[in-house]
Design a protein with these regions (language model features):
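Charged catalytic and DNA/RNA-contacting regions of genome-maintenance
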Residues: 1-337, 343, 350-363, 367-459, ...
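Cytosolic, long alpha-helical scaffolding segments
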Residues: 410, 417-418, 424, 480-496
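Extended, charged coiled-coil "arm/hinge" scaffolds of SMC/Rad50-like chromosome-maintenance ATPases
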Residues: 502, 506-540
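Short, amphipathic C-terminal "tail helix"
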Residues: 368-371, 842-863
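ATPase nucleotide-binding head domains, primarily ABC-like/P-loop NTPase cores
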Residues: 35-38, 233, 303-304, 314, ...
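Charged, surface-exposed helical/loop "interaction arms" that form contiguous linear patches used
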Residues: 364, 368, 378-381, 399, ...
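Active-site phosphate-binding and catalytic loops of NTP-dependent enzymes
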Residues: 89, 112-121, 254, 392-396, ...
Length: 863
């Protein structure tokens, strides 16, 4: 260290305290990075890597790269998006006033979960940091969106605490997680976070101390919030304390904006695991990971970023309380029924910016003049929103009308202080409105050339000296001067200092002119400082009203979400469902909300659904591939979920008994990294469903048992069906799609089981899917016909038909257990061939693969 330059010594000392971060080290107008940070940043940001003197010897060089400080947001955003932490090291004193080395310190550490800059955020979804506590008895998790100030916390206990914890993580999809020692030791939890949720994981053992946590929660949220946390489960406070500790470590600033805390019980929201969210494509599609094609894509007609985040939150957290659901659906209904008010309200909402995140940036001190003007414009637009809400005096819309604070005082202060189109930076002046501050006006006059001041001096000097040809000018040699023609040079006062003789006169300077010149030279610096001082004072005034703005923003967000649901309901001809605790799901002419929009001009065939507490509790659905079984089952699940967020639903009429969870087992794939086959993945998921489901759950099970031999698969499928149907063991409402037609015999044998199939029509050799769900079981799967539709070569289809005819003629029927003593090896071979045909995916096969399959099947047949 002794051989290092003072600046490099300072850098290394600061870097030592921030080893896990890329250090942005402020040097003049640049943020510089050195050593390994420089190499990493150069690679990730496409920067030129150079070197700098490290020590007193010229041979000692260190890698270096840099970026302009005023354009750093974009670079930081790129690093954060890749999961890095960035420590911002600023000069904490004026370099012009520094004695020796300029003092520097870390002002904040930017991480994926603590970022607040708009360049780093998706304005239509929340950005959550979470604290996770897990031990042998309890689990707790807290989520905080720093950009809006909202915090949510919950806790669990018992044997299934880890499963509930994972479901909450899947619900919020945090950008970053701080884990306690117990949580960090849970490998499955880390895999979920890092691999499946793309979440940055931070180990934070020391941050999870109960006494420190309780103290931090009290200081941050107050006594009422502390009282709301469960006393019998400290995991909630521990998770919240770990989160707050990390926030204070990284932000190094006032966090008073984070004041909105919600503790929620496990039973308040419908629970969905990651598999259900993925299979139902709530917010993104499975294949493209895109919004288009998801349920959110259909429902999102919001006009504000706040409304978009609120709608997403509702989709992620469907309600279970009937009264709360009804309040929402009644509000949607009121907007549906008042066309003019709805359309005018939507128009008014479209003029409102992201007030939640604007006030966040103002409080954190990162807002500029443009942010304040945007806030002012949004506040002024509230009057139009309130005008439309005046039509609704009762229900949730009436309450929202009262929750909209006009905020006129804040808008007026911004309007009188800040110009309508301020510059980007608040450090370079030019944004304080004329007439607000006399000194700023005077400095602006000086900066514009001091024309007013020069004119007043010129007039004054003419009157004082009687020299009517006197005029003030400027040149680069000696600055401002007074020019007097030869005919008046005898009247020049003694206070004038001659600087230049001309053919027709003389040029002079005065002390007053020199003072003015000095003012002009320093006016820019003084104006920048004064304007920033005035801006800071205004910012502090706005911060004092932050809670008012937060509450109004929340009301706007909810209103925008309700309006969006109303717009979609009218456009797509949805109905208002009756939501109750009956346990019945009854849907008349239900439609898949996404598929019908994707089809556009094509007609979507609606279907009825009835599932009761006793009758029709389990529906066995048979029919060929591509007929629409999976679409129908997803449709029922999505309509149920939509009803429980308070939305209208795509149906002629609907009655939805509240469900506590929706589980899905649809499709499968090998988990190669985990060393699990398709069948193993399927069985693991089914096991979790049967372990976690309750009698109030809705189960969507597709092709259970297809990944193994026919007998094994059919046995497993039947056992699962029996378990689901048995009210003593589970008794959950279940939609069960299968190609095992033998299972249709369970209707009449198991209470609550009902058979359905997808209607089809044969036209000669062709198959027509009618997409209609009708009572009864299908007699066959039409796999070869589907293979033909998928484009399998004619010779392969013909050969498959012949093989199937031979198998059927060969008596491959497996009699019931009571009719047989032992299954023949011939029957087993034939059954395996049939099973392989059922599992074949012709739409993904090449002709060569199809031929190879046929050869393999032929080998399995008995001689």
């Amino acid at each position: 260290m002794a051989d290092l330059t003072p600046m490099m010594r300072q850098y290394l000392e600061i870097k030592e305290q921030n080893k896990d971060s890329i250090l942005f080290f402020r040097l003049g107008d640049f943020y510089e990075m050195f050593n390994e940070d420089a190499k990493l940043a150069a690679r990730e940001l496409d920067l030129v890597l150079t070197t700098r003197d490290r020590g007193k010897s010229a041979e000692e060089q260190t890698p270096m790269c840099g970026i302009p400080y005023h354009s750093s947001d974009g670079y930081i955003a790129r690093l954060i998006a890749k999961g890095y932490k960035v420590a911002i090291c600023e000069q904490t004193e004026d370099p012009a006033l520094a004695k020796g080395l300029v003092k520097r310190d870390i002002i904040r550490v930017v991480t994926p979960g603590t970022v607040i800059d708009s360049a780093c955020l998706d304005d239509r979804r929340g950005n959550f940091l979470c604290g996770v506590f897990l031990d042998e008895q309890n689990a707790g998790v807290a989520f905080c969106d720093m950009s809006t100030g909202h915090t949510h916390v919950t806790a669990f206990s018992g044997a299934d605490r880890a499963e509930h914890l994972c479901n909450e993580l899947a619900r919020f999809t945090p950008a970053e997680a701080v884990l306690s020692a117990g949580a960090y030791a849970d490998e499955e939890l880390k895999v979920l976070l890092a691999d499946r949720l793309s979440c940055r994981v931070e180990r934070g053992d020391a941050r999870f101390d109960l006494k420190a946590a309780e103290k931090a929660v009290l200081a941050q949220y107050g006594e009422d919030a502390c009282a709301a946390l469960p006393r019998n489960n400290p995991a909630a406070a521990l998770a919240l304390g770990g989160l707050l500790s990390y926030l204070h470590e990284t932000q190094k600033s006032d966090l008073s904006y984070i004041s909105d805390l919600e503790y929620y019980e496990q039973g308040r929201f419908m629970e969905l695991d990651l598999s259900a969210r993925r299979n139902l494509e709530l917010t993104e599609t499975i294949r493209g990971k895109e919004k288009r094609g998801s349920l959110l894509w259909v429902l999102d007609k919001t006009k504000t970023a706040m409304g978009a985040r609120c709608l997403r939150s509702w989709l992620e957290r469907p309600l279970r309380e009937v009264a709360a659901i009804t309040r929402r659906s009644n509000a949607v209904g009121a907007l549906v029924n008042d066309t003019m008010a709805r359309e005018e309200l939507v128009l008014a909402l479209s003029g409102i910016s992201d007030m939640e995140r604007l006030i966040g940036r103002i409080v954190y001190g990162t807002a500029g003049g443009r942010d304040l003007v945007s806030l002012r414009n949004s506040i002024e637009q509230l009057a139009a929103v309130r005008e439309q809400l005046a039509h609704f005096t009762t229900g949730r819309l009436g309450e929202l009308s009262q929750e909209l604070d006009p905020l006129a005082d804040i808008a007026a202060r911004i309007a009188e202080t800040i110009v309508d189109e301020p510059p980007f930076s608040v450090r370079e002046g030019g944004f304080i409105r004329k007439g607000f501050n006399a000194e700023v006006d005077r400095l602006h006059d000086i900066l514009s050339g001091g024309k007013g001041l020069l004119a007043s001096i010129e007039t004054k000097e003419k009157e004082r000296t009687g020299i009517r040809t006197l005029k003030i000018g400027y040149n680069k040699v000696f600055g401002y001067y007074i020019e007097v023609s030869n005919s008046f040079k005898d009247q020049v006062p003694d206070t004038y200092i001659r600087k230049q003789t001309l053919v027709n006169g003389e040029r002079y300077i005065t002390q007053e002119l020199k003072d003015l010149e000095q003012e002009i030279l320093t006016a820019g610096e003084r104006d920048n400082a004064l304007e920033y001082e005035l801006f800071s004072a205004l910012r502090d005034e706005i911060c004092a009203g932050a809670e008012r703005i937060q509450k109004t923003a929340a009301a706007v967000a909810e209103l925008d979400t309700l309006a969006s649901l109303a717009v979609v309901a009218v456009k797509n001809n949805y109905c208002c469902p009756v939501v109750d605790d009956s346990g019945v799901i009854e849907i008349h002419d239900g439609r898949h909300p996404v598929v019908e929009r994707v089809l556009k001009d094509a007609l979507f065939v609606p279907n009825d659904t009835y599932m009761g507490e006793k009758e029709n509790r389990v529906a066995i659905i048979t029919g060929p591939n591509m007929a629409g079984k999976s679409t129908y089952m997803r449709q029922v699940a999505l309509i149920t979920l939509m009803a429980q967020i308070g939305s209208f639903v795509p149906a002629r009429a609907a009655r939805i008994g509240v469900v506590d969870r929706i589980f899905t087992r649809i499709g499968a794939s090998d988990d190669l990294a985990g060393g699990q086959s398709t069948f193993m993945v399927e069985m693991s998921e089914v096991a979790e469903i049967l372990r976690q489901a309750t009698a109030h759950s809705l189960l969507i099970l597709d092709e259970i048992g297809r990944g193994t031999s026919t007998f094994d698969g059919m046995s497993i499928a039947r056992a699962v069906l029996e378990f689901c149907a048995d009210r003593k063991r589970l008794g959950a409402k279940t939609l069960f799609a299968t190609h095992y037609h033998e299972l249709t015999e369970l209707e009449g044998t198991l209470a609550g089981v009902k058979n359905y199939n997808i209607a089809i029509k044969k036209r000669g050799e062709d198959l027509v899917f009618l997409r209609k769900i009708i009572p009864g079981g299908a007699d066959r799967s039409y796999g070869i016909e589907v293979a033909k539709l998928a484009g399998l070569p004619k010779e392969v289809v013909s050969r498959a038909k012949k093989i199937l005819e031979e198998l059927e003629a060969g008596g491959s029927y497996i009699p019931p257990r009571e009719e047989r003593e032992q299954v023949s090896l011939d029957a087993i071979g034939e059954a395996e061939v049939l099973d392989a045909l059922r599992r074949a995916q012709p739409d993904t096969m090449s002709p060569i693969e199809a031929m190879q399959l046929l050869y393999d099947l032929k080998k399995k047949l008995p001689n």
